Amino acid sequence: EGIALYEGRAYFTTKHDNRVWVYHTNTQELEVLYDVKTSDNPILTGVDNVVITPTGDVLIAEDGGDMQIVVLTDEGSVAPLLQVVGHEQSEITGPAFDPSYQRLYFSSQRGSLGKSSGGITYEVSRSDLV
C-alpha cells in the first residue's frame, strides 16, 4: 500500500497481512517491523500510507481499523499518535509533513458522512512550535 524512503531504507506496508516492512538498500535485507499477528501491542490494523519523521519514526495511516495514525519506531514500539472519531466509513489518507516538519497533514477520505464528497483534510501542529 504505502511506501516511504529514509536514509537508505524503504518502508512499506502490505494490507492483506497487516505488516510494515523495511528494505535496507545497503545490505539488501528485508525485515518485518510490525506484524499484527505477532505484535505485543497489536493496535495497528488496515495498514496503508506511510510517512517518516525527521528522527526516523514511521507514521502509518489506517485504512479502516480505528482510524488512527500510529507511530512505529525502529525498536518496534508502536503507539497511536492520533485518532479521527466519527468517520467509521472512511480511511485516513495522504499523511505528509510540511517542509519544516512543523505540521502534519492528512485527510479523512470520505469524512463523517462516508461519502466521496465528504472528505476533509486536517493540519496538526504542536502549540509550542507555532
Predicted feature residues:
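Sequence/structural signature of beta-propeller domains
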Residues: E1-V130
